[in-house]
Structure formats: structure tokens, C-alpha cells
UniProtKB/Swiss-Prot annotation:
Pathway: Amino-acid biosynthesis; L-arginine biosynthesis; L-arginine from L-ornithine and carbamoyl phosphate: step 3/3. HAMAP family: Arg_succ_lyase (MF_00006). The record marks E294 as: Increases basicity of active site His. This is Argininosuccinate lyase.
Amino acid sequence: MASEGDKLMGGRFVGSTDPIMQMLSTSMSTEQRLSEVDIQASIAYAKALEKAGILTKTELEKILSGLEKISEEWSKGVFVVTQSDEDIHTANERRLKELIGDIAGKLNTGRSRNEQVVTDLKLFMKNSLSVISTHLLQLIKTLVERAAIEIDVILPGYTHLQKAQPIRWSQFLLSHAVALTRDSERLGEVKRRINVLPLGSGALAGNPLDIDREMLRSELDFASISLNSMDAISERDFVVEFLSVATLLMIHLSKMAEDLIIYSTSEFGFLTLSDAFSTGSSLMPQKKNPDSLELIRSKAGRVFGRLASILMVLKGLPSTYNKDLQEDKEAVFDVVDTLTAVLQVATGVISTLQISKENMEKALTPEMLSTDLALYLVRKGMPFRQAHTASGKAVHLAETKGITINNLTLEDLKSISPLFSSDVSQVFNFVNSVEQYTAMGGTAKSSVTTQIEHLRELMKKQKEQA
């Protein structure tokens, strides 16, 4: 139980904090991850205090020496957390006093935990988003380079989980890569909005000591300085934006995982996952389960929940700082860890899976070329709606005869439309089918190659900004 003397603001209070209240209030177990950035921010603030004449040069040197010692203790895992440490700020402040005495109390002159915590969180997120961006770009690169290698593989494309039209395997891979590039762009946008310094805002009214905030900005490598102190210490837009971007990213990863799970089933047999990303059954020896993909899919729900929870926290808050905001860090840390793990696993899955070109080609059926049959008539001058009807009649006639559409005779087809001639046989070729989609974004080889080149250039730009 914290005694009156243990309280950071003990002068105002008589008696001890209720132990249950203390347990509810403390965030120390979560905030230990902020230890290094908290010290980093304190070092910058100490230098600003010295420039403002609050600290002497000797006092600054003692404070910096103490902070460096604390940083070393955290890095070596020997920092001792006490029961009275409510959060990372009080823990570091308490330890600094133990090391250098009462001079430590000068460090927080004009500084509030309200500004400390948001500064720490922004510093942490700047670093974390750079790591996540790197992992995301590696996944995109893996998809793109695999698409380049396996560009000649053709398989069924699906809508409503029913066979629709032939596509290149590369077109499938690139569809996911393109979605992920949007996530990469959004991460960059969030990082730019995080990059605004709140330190120097005080509890809410600002800093009264003529602190040089431009110096703080430079020391902590922020791009700009917050404009309004009340907004700076309370805004968590950047948390919501990050969790929103993470939610969209997980939607895309979940979709990709679901596609690959389906394609890996024995019913499809299009691909096989590496043993490194599969598990077995505790009962059935023959099983090879796609647990890696299932976990990616399930982690999406976890991230969605974090976004929903922080939105509920923020919804009813009045202006400036409220203790409710303590919930933001757990959400951020959890999602950072989830994305970091999921992106690396997804990259591993994509880089090691083996495709079955034979099974993909076997799954191609003549009925998938019904659209091509309609387009054949369009090229002969028939309006598309009439051509669509004519092709549908051909499908029905083939079903009635118990044969595939490509086995209808020329006479059968002419009974539907006199525009059919002997060159209709060229329609029933899967390579010809995919090669007609030459418009930008299509599944023709030339178009897919253009997509690959474009994505490579885009990745270069995004890597420079990560």
C-alpha cells in the first residue's frame, strides 16, 4: 500500500491509497515498454530546462548521468519496480531521486505527466510504425516477385466462390499486393500525423518557463510542434487512425488467408503450405492444418476489438486529459505486436508455399469461357446483351445434351446464331482467354507485367518514406 509520502502528489492527501484503487490505477506493467522513450524525452526536457535557466550546468550533468544509469538498468533488465510506481514516469522519477537526490525533483519543473505520456506514446509509435512498414513492404515484395516468377500459371478465378473466368495466378497474387500498398500508404500518413511534438504543453495551459519547444522538437526528431496545449495533451486521433489502418490491413490479410486456406484444401488442391507454417492433429495422423493462415484470420478480430474499445473510451470524454486515456497504450502495444508477428508469418507462408500448376489447370472448365463466347459474337457485331443471351443458350444446349460447351458442333452453335463460324474454336483456349484482357489492370501477360513494374517502383518510393 502506498503511504502518504509515497504518493507523487502526497502533500494534498491524508492517508494511504486503497490497495484495490492502486491496483486499478497502476499501468506500470504495461508501460515498461515506454521506459527508453520516457528517458529520451526527459533528457531532451532537461536540456531545455538548462537553456531556460532552471537548471545549472552541473545539475543538468547530474540529471543526465542519472537518466543514463536508469536507461542502462532497463536495458539490462535490472531496474527494480516498486509497489509505489504508478506508471513509467513515476518509476523513473523515483529511481532518479534515489541516484542523485533532491535535484531529481527539478526535472519535472513545468512538466506534467499529461504531456509526458502522449510524448512517450508518439515516440514509441514512430519507431513501431517504421518497423511495421518494413515488414509490410517485405510481404508486398514477396507477392510481387512470386507473381513475376509464376506469371504463366493459369487457374480459375472465382466470384461467389463459383468458377467465373480464367486468370493468371500472378493476377491473384497482385490483387493482394495492390491492396497492401494502400495499407502501406495509410501507415505513412498516420506516421506523418504522429510526428507532431506535444512536449511543452504542460498539464493543459502550456509551459510558463519559456521552454524552447523548437529545441525539444529537434532533440526528439519531430517534424512540427503542436499548436494548442489543450488539444496536444488530450488528442488521441493518431491512436484511432493507427488502429483503423491496422483494421483495414488485417481485413486484407484475413481475406488473403481465407483464399489460401480454400486453395490448400484437398477439394481444390491448388497449393500446399510449407511444414514450417502448418501443424498436425492430436488424433488424426494424416492432417496438415493451415494454422498459420487461420491465426492470421483470427487475429483480425482481435485488432477490430481494440479499435472498437478505444472509440468507446474516447466517445464520452470532456476536453483535456482524463485517466480514461490510460487505456490507449494497451491497445497500441497489442496491435503493434499483432501486426509485427502476422506480417512476418504471412511473408513466410507466401515465400514457401508450393503451387500445383497441374491441379490449377485441371480445374479450368470450358463453361468458364462462356463470357468469351459472348465476346466472340460482340466482335462479330452483335450487341452484348443479345450475345450474353446467345451464350447462355449455348450453355443450356450443352447441359441438355450432357456435353461441355466446347463440344457443341458448329451446327449446334449456328442454330443459336448465324454469326458463329469455324473460327469459334479459338474461343475455347484458356491462354487466348486471359490474353484478351490487355487493358490496364487486366490479366493478360502484358498487363500483369506492367502491374509488376509499377508495384516495384511504388515500393521503392514507399521504402524511402518508411
